[in-house]
Amino acid sequence: MLPHRDPATQPEGVVAGYAQTASRWPAEPLVRRPQTRTELGAPQPRRRLAPARGDLAGHGTKRAAGQLIHLRARVVDEDGAPVAGALVEVWHCNAAGKYIHPNDTNDAPADPNFYGAARLVAGDSGLVELRTIKPGAYPVPDTRVWWRPPHIHFSVWGRVWLSRLVTQMFFPGEPLNETDYILNAIRDPAARSRSLARLMPTERGPANALVYEYQLVVRGRGATPSLP
């Protein structure tokens, strides 16, 4: 069964101006099918995938380069109730705009002290916490040059395999937000604002990190926009 998808708040997977998104979206129309015991009772992802580190910034004196941030992300449903036990996967580039995976052709320098990805399990309040560095911007390898603003990728698994949200979190006040094809594929301004983290200017995180908060709404009409 396909969830409600408002085109104003949930953009299509193929984003104009970003050719790579064509390979991340079904080429054929989606098919609606009834929910069965298989869809509702499949193995829970968190039982198959163990939670990993919640620190991407390194340890001790060997810390990743860049602005240290402490991120608090809360997973909730459409009623605001916490989704305890949700499996949250996080990944982003380093401060120079370089990802750790081998397919990244950006010639920016790698950071040997930056881990690049984490896997966390939400607690009873739906909260996961992560220490990392603020990612950098990077140019998109496309027919025309444009830059991705700093952003963090999330994959949130629910209680079954077919319950998954893939999205991106952006930082407020970034000039490149205004020209980003991914963020601006969300046509509704209110929905677009739900993809922005909130800076907590009066708080100080561990090791003097900037503190950001973000809410991941996994379903419903107020769901966090799905982004590739």
Language-model region placement:
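Beta-strand-dominated extracellular/periplasmic modules and repeats
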Residues: 1-228
